[in-house]
Amino acid sequence: MLKEKLHPFIQRYNEINELLSSPEITQDIKKMTALSKEQSEIEPIVEKAKEYMNILEAIEENRSLIEDEELGELAKEELKELEPKKEQLEEEIKVLLISKDPNDEKDIYLEIRAGTGGEEAALFASDLFKAYARYAEKKGWRVEIVSSSESDSGGYKEIIAKIKGQGVYSRLKYEAGTHRVQRVPETESQGRIHTSAVTVAIMPEVDDVDVEINPNDLKIDVYRSSGHGGQSVNTTDSAVRITHIPTGIVVAMQDEKSQHKNKEKALKILKARIFEKRMREQQEALAKDRKEQVGSGDRSERIRTYNFPQNRVTDHRIGLTLYKLEEVMQGDLDQIIEPLIAHYQAQKIQEAGL
């Protein structure tokens, strides 16, 4: 019963209230801060729980009045309103009860790489980046290109951008994986559809507490940065390549004129990649334990197909097909993101036995 699951939260909330007013706690700033944080975390559950208890009481009261000659009809009308409210509250409470992803409020590094399909893949990498940038704009987030490598046709072989704002990771985390595109390239005279792919990685920005790197585990190379077509654009060794020896992760950065700035940027991305790798390994281990492979954010997992001739986009994880590709590419990504969030929330609720 959901009611039983809510009582400990109400008890703990009241307990914290008492503790916060005790002189022993008010003199200990560390304890006071920790308790206030805990209280603010459970407050949304407690508020909904109280509302839910009131509705349950009202339902019980009205049910007892159904046989009453004078109040029976009124009680039936009340119940018609209360029952749907109860069901809606139950769903809202279940979502609040499932464990929150600690990374949900973090900013992210978005990395898009052209895969199979050469120039066509690079052009789609550019189109996909623009779609995310438009989506970010709609959400009031800030997008900053950290590094990019252009292809001959003006697409991106690879682009890394930082996206900052409220709840960025919570909404974009399900974008990680392989995105397949089917369309007729402009250079195709026969009108044949070509299939190409890009991979997307979504890495929460991490601080030193999340990822500690031993300097001895790093191999740092400096070299001259090169421009489009390979020509050298710098006379000093400002470009930086950092290799994390234990994981084999390599980050190269040459977008800044200063070696120091390139190194700083490269280290931040390196930490994010290490963190994302660890996170992915944990998710894969959990998925094996559950004998199922959920959308784990694995880059090799094909998550979505964009079919331009049919104006169709399909998300393979939840079997969602929309004939609104144009809207999606203009940044209207919530049409896909909202059903994905709902799907994974429902999965978590089921796993939690709620």
Curated annotation (Swiss-Prot):
One of its GO terms (molecular function) is translation release factor activity, codon specific. Residues 284-304 have a biased composition (Basic and acidic residues). One of its GO terms (cellular component) is cytoplasm. Methylated by PrmC. Methylation increases the termination efficiency of RF1. It comes from the Bacteria. PROSITE patterns: RF_PROK_I. Its main location: cytoplasm. Residues 284-308 are annotated as: Disordered. InterPro entries: PCRF, Pep_chain_release_fac_I, Pep_chain_release_fac_I_sf, Prokaryotic/Mito_RF, RF-1. Belongs to the prokaryotic/mitochondrial release factor family. This is Peptide chain release factor 1. The lineage of its organism: Bacteria, Pseudomonadati, Campylobacterota, Epsilonproteobacteria, Nautiliales.
